[in-house]
Amino acid sequence: DFTDVKGHWAEGTLHQAYDDGILKGYDAKTMAPNRSVTMVQAVTILCRVLHVTGLGDISQFEIPQDAWYAQDVAKGVYAGLLEEQDAQVLNDPIPRGQAFILFGQAFQVVGAQPDLSVLDQFPDTAFLTGEQARAAAALVEAGIVSGSGGALQLDRPLTRAEFATILYRLADQYIPAAEYEGHIGTGSVLSGDAEIVGRTVGDLWFDQSSSNIHLTDVTASSVTIRADRL
């Protein structure tokens, strides 16, 4: 057991993230739940969750080929999570506002016209860019984030515990599609080929390992397909 998880406000989520292979221990005894997440760490985890295998062009990032994160950055570029302008902040702690954008891009939860009025309750959202405002509004409206102390604290670095919490509020099940039998929860990320018949479910995300998907008489809150081999 990790010594710094017991009694933590996100204890259950942290254990689940570890069991699911989403988060790893910081060392043999700790998970460092209050430690900040860097941009490249966030992208690496999201690409792991979505089983991204394609590699984008990272020649403009000037990353040493032997850097541990070189392939993860290439996956992030391929998945549309990273752009050239992010090259200078890959190893910086990711602010909560930027993390909201990443989650929105990864799970495609930001609609064309989200209700921006939901941000009026937070005094620190008045000067957001359009992209930041849309991502924050979509997550607030969906009940994924609610702020702390009356504010969204968009400039504060996101912690590992917060990252796991937002992730599991978006989707709390990560399984092969062939094993899917319906799920009542926040959502499911499914990998591989799928044939789902006669189910009423929440949100479904098919990751980039899916290539053959058949849905018959399925009622879902939303269905997002990130596969590129259909």
Label every PLM stretch briefly.
Residues A136:
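Catalytic cores of secreted/periplasmic or lumenal enzymes
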Residues D1-E11, D19, K24-G97, F103-A133, ...:
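Feature responds to low-complexity, polar/acidic, surface-exposed segments characteristic
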Residues A178-G198, G202-L230:
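Short, T/G/N/S-enriched strand-turn elements that build extracellular solenoid repeat scaffolds
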